[in-house]
Amino acid sequence: MGAKSMEGMNLKQTAIADFHHVSVLPTALVEGLEPKPGGYYLDATVGAGGHSERLLKLGIPLALTMIDRDVQAIAAAMERLQPLVADRKDISINTWQGNFADFPGQLEQFDGIIADLGVSSPQLDQGDRGFSFRHTAPLDMRMDQSQDLTAAEIINHWSEKDLARIFYEYGEERLSRRIARQIVEQRPFQTTTDLAEAITKWVPGKYRHGRIHPATRTFQGLRIAVNDELGSLEKFIAQAPHWLKSGGKFGIISFHSLEDRIVKHRFRETENLRVLTKKPIIAGEEEQRQNPRARSAKLRWAEKI
């Protein structure tokens, strides 16, 4: 399935022991997909395989292609799903490692497409990936470890103007100019904790004991820039409807207002899509209690016409 297909790769060689992720809105996503026997479905952000697992547990014959930028995510998903498909000749699974915006989809290929955006819990929790300031790690933040651009490259080499722009536009950080100016004056920075501690010192005292850590928005902006998350989402939504058969469902879970705004407006503006959710579907109180990540999740659906 292309240069980045995982077929034939020994996934056992990939470290997956720590890649555990609880999927959000699993019931709403699978039910909204309306799977049918013999259907062909695309999980565009497989993560650890939670949503695909729900789909396979329906027990119907189907074909499934799973995408993720992170090779560890695909390995974890395959290990998780193997018991469900080991004796099923009527189920076909393909994997493709890379950015969903670059997937070589074909015209009217799928009966349904789902995507769960953003960074996964294992990526946040694995200290060496550099996504979180809870762990001391190199400033990395790459979802795809084969790409060249890292958070360290951005922090230590981009201009003050560009740093302020990504912190403001992608992180919605009101102190973006102040933080960018201090970074340029005091760089280089090598680790997540060095940067986070410095940001904490630079912001006014009233921001140091708020609901979120003073570095949270800066780190979000940095991560989105490293992985071109919003640009990739725009490209994906522009292409994916062409891969859907007529009547096929397209569901996307977003986790912050920037993503949700793109999904909402692109679904509405795309001529061959009909919006099925005037308001986004959100997690119930019980799911939010069990999985705090679900609190910010919003699911929107569209249908190919």
Swiss-Prot record:
Its EC number is 2.1.1.199. Keywords: Cytoplasm, Methyltransferase, rRNA processing, S-adenosyl-L-methionine, Transferase. S-adenosyl-L-methionine binds at residues 49-51, 68, 100, 116, 123. It is found in: Cytoplasm. It catalyses: cytidine(1402) in 16S rRNA + S-adenosyl-L-methionine = N(4)-methylcytidine(1402) in 16S rRNA + S-adenosyl-L-homocysteine + H(+). Specifically methylates the N4 position of cytidine in position 1402 (C1402) of 16S rRNA. This is Ribosomal RNA small subunit methyltransferase H.
